[in-house]
Amino acid sequence: MVTAFLNERQATTEEMALVSNALAAYSFIADQPERAALYFVCGVCLGLVLTLIALVVQISCRTDCKTQQAPKKTGKTVENTSDTSDSDSDWDNTSDLSARRHRRFERTLGNVFTSAEELERAQRLEERERIIREIWMNGQPDMPGTRSLNRYY
């Protein structure tokens, strides 16, 4: 009976603490709305940054793990059949690492344009921008003051 009363009283105090904390938060927001808004925006921004970091780490780890698993299987067969010196194998490992990084970079570039039409459209846009830049550079009016300063202009 006494334990039931203590448990009920403890539950009541926990509920009262929750209500008290909610009222304290409301009074803080009512007294200082700018500060509360600043804390809210900072919390949202921090959450977005942490989510972005988690996504970047997940994507980079996923691509690194996939590229590391494939060479391990082929690397054992290559090590058993090769009779080269240690310096040559070190050079092979570094070149293999750079080749893997290059392939990963090319793979990300390849995923940007999913179809040939998008690739062609992007190339036409780049060409158009280059032509506009050339027209802009060549179409500037000649200023008499700058011509007299440099005879090779």
From Swiss-Prot:
Top-rank taxon, per record: Eukaryota
Function in brief: Acts as a regulator of programmed cell death, mediating both autophagy and apoptosis.
Gene: Eva1a
GO biological process: apoptotic process; autophagy
Similarity annotation: Belongs to the EVA1 family.
Name of the protein this chain belongs to: Protein eva-1 homolog A
Pfam families: FAM176
Source organism: Danio rerio (Zebrafish)
Broad class of the protein's primary localization: endoplasmic reticulum
Membrane topology type: Single-pass membrane protein
Keywords for this protein: Apoptosis, Autophagy, Endoplasmic reticulum, Lysosome, Membrane, Transmembrane, Transmembrane helix
Span list, region Disordered: 66-97
GO CC annotation, single: lysosomal membrane
